[in-house]
Amino acid sequence: MRIGLGYDVHKLVENRPLIIGGVTIPHDKGLLGHSDADVLVHAIMDALLGAAALGDIGKHFPDSDKNFKNISSLLLLSKVKDLINKEGYKIVNIDCTIIAQKPKMLYHINAMKKNICKCLKLDNNMLNIKATTEEGLGFTGKEEGISANAICLLD
C-alpha cells in the first residue's frame, strides 16, 4: 500500500475558461496555466505519481513542451494512470478538496466525479471530491486563485 499527496494552485485571470475536474464552470475568470490549468486533476496526478514514486507532473509533462499547451488535463491523467499501472499499482481510493471562494463548486462535483472516474476507470465510491472556501482569507479567499489538494491510496 502506498499513499500519495498532491497539491496544485493556479491564478484566476480574465479571458480563460474555468475548467475543474474536466468541467467547464461558468465564471467571469478562468485559471492561468500551460495546459487547461485544471487544479483538481493536477493535484490528483501529483498524488498518484507521488504514491508510485514517479516524480511529479512537471517531470512528465513540462510546461516548456509545446505538445502540452492547452491540453486537457484529463488526457494527462489517463497517461498518469497508465504509468502507475505499468509499475504494478492500482488505485484503491482518492480524496480531494477544492479551495475556492467563488464560484460555488457544489453544483459541479457530480460531473467532476463522473469525468475523473471514467478517465481512471474507478467505481464512484473510490473517489471523493469536496469543496471549501477560506472565508475570504488568503489568495483563494480574495478570489485571486483556486487550489486543490488530493490524497490517494495505491495497492
UniProtKB/Swiss-Prot annotation:
Site (Transition state stabilizer): 34, 133
Keyword list, A-Z: Isoprene biosynthesis, Lyase, Metal-binding
The keyword Metal-binding belongs to this UniProt entry's keyword annotation: yes
Single GO MF descriptor: 2-C-methyl-D-erythritol 2,4-cyclodiphosphate synthase activity
Known cofactor(s): a divalent metal cation
Cofactor, free-text remark: Binds 1 divalent metal cation per subunit.
SUPFAM superfamilies to which the protein is assigned, alphabetical: IpsF-like
Chain residues that bind 4-CDP-2-C-methyl-D-erythritol 2-phosphate: 8-10, 34-35, 56-58, 61-65, 100-106, 132-135, 139, 142
A GO biological process held by the record: terpenoid biosynthetic process
Reactions accelerated catalytically: 4-CDP-2-C-methyl-D-erythritol 2-phosphate = 2-C-methyl-D-erythritol 2,4-cyclic diphosphate + CMP
EC numbers: 4.6.1.12
Entry-linked InterPro entries: MECDP_synthase (IPR003526), MECDP_synthase_CS (IPR020555), MECDP_synthase_sf (IPR036571)
Keyword Calcium: no
Binding site for a divalent metal cation: 8, 10, 42
Pathways per UniProt: Isoprenoid biosynthesis; isopentenyl diphosphate biosynthesis via DXP pathway; isopentenyl diphosphate from 1-deoxy-D-xylulose 5-phosphate: step 4/6
Alphabetized Gene3D superfamilies for the sequence: 2-C-methyl-D-erythritol 2,4-cyclodiphosphate synthase (3.30.1330.50)
Family per similarity comment: Belongs to the IspF family.
Subunit comment: Homotrimer.
Function text: Involved in the biosynthesis of isopentenyl diphosphate (IPP) and dimethylallyl diphosphate (DMAPP), two major building blocks of isoprenoid compounds. Catalyzes the conversion of 4-diphosphocytidyl-2-C-methyl-D-erythritol 2-phosphate (CDP-ME2P) to 2-C-methyl-D-erythritol 2,4-cyclodiphosphate (ME-CPP) with a corresponding release of cytidine 5-monophosphate (CMP).
Protein name, UniProt field: 2-C-methyl-D-erythritol 2,4-cyclodiphosphate synthase
Native source species: Clostridium botulinum (strain Okra / Type B1)
Gene from which this protein is expressed: ispF
